C-alpha cells in the first residue's frame, strides 16, 4: 500500500524532486526607483504612444493592469514601497545639519513628539512662551513678509525643495523691495502656526 501511494504521488507531481528558485537569489531590485511614467503596463494597448504621453503628464497610477480582479504582484509591491516612503517622510525629522546649511535656526510648537504632533493637531498650531521669546530675540520685528519653513507631514519635501525655493523666494521679495523677516524652521508645525508667528513678530504677511 505504501508503495502504491508513493507511485501515485510521483505521478501527480510529475516526479519533481527539486524546485528551481522563482527569483534570482541575488540583490532584489528597488521597486521605488522604477519610473512608472515610462513603463507600459497595459498589454497590447490601442495607442501605446499616446498612453505613455498621458502617463508622462501626471503622477497618477494609470494603466497598472491586473491579474483577474487583483493588482499584479509588481504593482502591489510598488504601492507598498511608495507607502513606506510616505511613512518615512512623516516620521523622519529634518536633519540639524540641513537646517544649519540653509541658515535656519529651529523652534518647536507645543508638540513634544511626533506622535503628539500626529494625534494633537491643535498643539501643532500653538507656540509656547519660550518659543515666542526666542523668535522675538532672533528675528527682525514687524517685517512686511515673514517666511519660515516647517516639516508638516513631509520632512522629505523640506529637504528636496528648500535649498532652491527659499533663496529664490527671498531674492524675489528683495527684488520687489519687499522687506522679508528672518527665516527659521518650526518643528512639528501645522498650517495654523503661521498665525502665532505673525502675532509674535508683527508681520503683515506670513
Placement of each model-derived feature along the sequence:
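Glycine-rich phosphate/diphosphate-binding loop of Rossmann-like nucleotide-binding domains
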Residues: 155-177
